[in-house]
Amino acid sequence: MAALISNIGGTIIMSLFLFQSDVRKKAKKLLGLIKKKQFALWQLLGGVAGAVYISTASSTVSVIGTGLFTVVLVASQNVSGILVDKFGFSSGKRKKITSKRLFAMLIGTFAVILTVSEFEGEILWIPIIAVVFAGLAVTLQFTLNARVTKYSNSQVSAFINFPMSMFAVTLTLIVMNLFGKNWNNWPDQWWLYSAGFLGAIVVYLAAATVRTLGVLLFGLATVAGQLVTSIILDVLMPNANVNVGFAMLFGAGLMLFAVYLASDLR
């Protein structure tokens, strides 16, 4: 249900861009390319890949825990991201697998291992494999949306993402209902409904920057932002289950260093 709410909100937010004449022109241009078969329809399925990630997250986090989920997801994103950049699948400039980028990928993964909570209990391989595919789905979402951006613009790409994702999530919920799974639980907290707005920002930024930054750098920067924000929130709103200690701070610092390495700054 959270995924559906997020996609509805994102669709509404991104629909506002259609009031801009330039966005409508770009959308018509893309439609023309599709009609001429100069742009394959499957490249519009970035939102479906995003829905795969959301559905996998909602069904595996409670089984393997947030810590292990995050580590496996980030590792999968990093490996797939560096390969996508290598072969230029996002329609951006190809980026060689240099020792610096490889080191950044490894540091980024290690940083997440440091900052997440320790995993306790039996390792369940089926959910872990599912999370690996979820990481691949996130990379695929960024890649496909970047390809749409190349032939239109980031607003059109982000707008297409949400209806596609909403369709996939709705279909998943219908199937769950057929198998007797109850999903009709609406959140009580009003602020949870802001997820669609925040998701729209992330998808838009990804569509606008991935072709330039590359999938690896965008992924590392996104995780770095999440880690820093989570530390700030944990300090401002302390949680008994979370300890902002040396490991978490050092891990966040390592992640920022990984972003620096991947950015090729001198």
Model-inferred region functions:
Residues M1-I12, S59-V79, I123-A137, N184-G199, ...:
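Structural signature of hydrophobic alpha-helical transmembrane segments
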